[in-house]
Amino acid sequence: MVWCWGMRPWIAATALLAGACAHSPSAPQPVPTPTPNPVERFPVAGVVFYDENANGVIDDRERVRLPGVSVAIGDRAARSDAEGRFLIADATEGSATASAEVESLPPFFTSGPVAALAVPPPPGFLLAYPVGLPIERMRPNLYMAFGDSITVGDGSRDGDGYRGELEAVLRGYWGAGSVANEGVASTRSDQGADRIGASLTRVRPAYTVIHYGTNDWNSYSCRWVPSCHTVSSVRSMIGSARSVGSVPVVGTLIPVNPAYTDRMAYERNVWVVETNERIRAMVKEEGAILADLHAGFTARGGSNLETLFVDHVHPNDDGYEVMATEFFRAITSPRGSASR
């Protein structure tokens, strides 16, 4: 029993039952934890567009929208859909800026400056997120197909080869795109290196799409020397394109039709494989875009590679479709994708 000083016994007993004395110390009380103010979050909608003139706003003629781009506002992010639109459902209230994940952009595209925005935005607000392409004075959305008779489209039913299909898929994906034909039949890669400057000046393409070297095999000096002048010539083409602001896209050499054994198809395909090894390494060194057409042909044709050809070297429509698919994949895939 706790005895309270000055209490009579019967009072002390009562105090014991009550559990306290007038001057006994009380137990420490816990300090209340302040309740944090809830974080307010609001939706922000936007669209990723190709800002052709770098003015930060969508002009009437700027039709290209970029799918698959990851855009972040604060600690929240969303990926743009097929029409370039995105919705961040829960952006944090306050002043914020948007940013794009570089690895989600296609090769050579850069994220443009975006002014700060207030969250929540006003009703009906759509954030226009600009991305750019460093093409200087070249013509936006114009692709120059550069090569020999395969680029011309020999063997295809419509005479367009891969160009028509590539143009169609680019327009369907970006919203714009035209492919110009600068192929010259029967030319070698060294001849292509000599003439590309004139083509670039005349066409002024945003992209230069190169497939050159198939006819180099016809030069006796090249036949038994893998790559011969092929790699140095294609390297020169890359430099010419880059010097005027055109984005270089290089395709590996497609195989030849293995059924034409009387035209040394086996030996020629060995040469193609060895040459492509050097082309891949060179393109990586130069920092250009690589489209692995040879890998696309072998994946599609398998053990029936001859089904992709109309003669000993020219593809049929199915073969040209493979070329268009691989060029399209190289141009549009995110730079951080596993295919690169």
Put a short name on every predicted segment.
Residues P255-R340:
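Catalytic His-Asp segment of secreted/periplasmic serine-dependent ester chemistry enzymes
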Residues P36-R41, V47-L66:
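Structural motif
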Residues S95-A128:
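A short, solvent-exposed loop/turn motif at the edges and junctions
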Residues G132-A185, G197-R204:
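Serine-esterase "nucleophile elbow" of acetyl-processing enzymes
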Residues L87-T97:
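Short Pro-Gly-centered beta-turn/loop motif in secreted/extracellular proteins
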Residues H211-W217, M237-V273, H294:
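Active-site segments of SGNH/GDSL-like serine hydrolases
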Residues V44-Y50, G84, V131:
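A short, amphipathic beta-strand motif
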Residues I58, R65, A72-L87:
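Short, acidic Ser/Thr/Gly-rich low-complexity loop/linker segments typical of extracellular
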